[in-house]
UniProtKB/Swiss-Prot annotation:
Its EC number is 3.1.21.10. It comes from the Bacteria. SUPFAM superfamilies: Ribonuclease H-like. Keywords: Cytoplasm, DNA damage, DNA recombination, DNA repair, DNA-binding, Endonuclease, Hydrolase, Magnesium, Metal-binding, Nuclease. The gene is ruvC. NCBIfam families: ruvC. PANTHER family: CROSSOVER JUNCTION ENDODEOXYRIBONUCLEASE RUVC. Belongs to the RuvC family. This is Crossover junction endodeoxyribonuclease RuvC. InterPro entries: RNaseH-like_sf (IPR012337), RNaseH_sf (IPR036397), X-over_junc_endoDNase_Mg_BS (IPR020563), X-over_junc_endoDNase_RuvC (IPR002176). It comes from Brucella canis (strain ATCC 23365 / NCTC 10854 / RM-666). Mg(2+) 1 binds at residues 11, 143.
Amino acid sequence: MKETIRIIGIDPGLRRTGWGIVESLGNSLHFIGSGTVTSNAEMDLASRLCQLHEGLSKVLHEFMPHEAAVEHTFVNKDATATLKLGQARGIALLAPAQAGLPVAEYAPNAVKKAVIGVGHGEKQQIHMMVKVLMPRASFDTSDAADALAIAICHAHHRQSIVSARRMQALLAG
């Protein structure tokens, strides 16, 4: 018997961290919610990270997902910006882990391939396919749309992850 799994996808960013929640039952996907957690750019870094953590924690408490998926960040030429993005990504991994959720991570190309069929594509293609896959989906920012795409990617890949975890448990036990 198949069970409904509620998944939160998180698109980390220091200014805006997108979140999107879907329910997966077999091959069927249903939109639950999406949004963006923001931090105040005028505050110090530690305070901004606290804002992101508090915002994500509220979303997790409100929607009670079963699993989480976070996108890997890319390294750019600005080392300081990359480091700050990495710290925001740490919050995106920490909040669901603290809530007791298993957290999967996906490269941007894997997300694109799961949603649009190829590993390289434009954001507009991803956003359009999110709407095709879940016609009731709504998102107010690009970050929220990307987070929904991350959740969709996890819904497509989760069975192989679950099987691998079971195999590890059998080998360890």
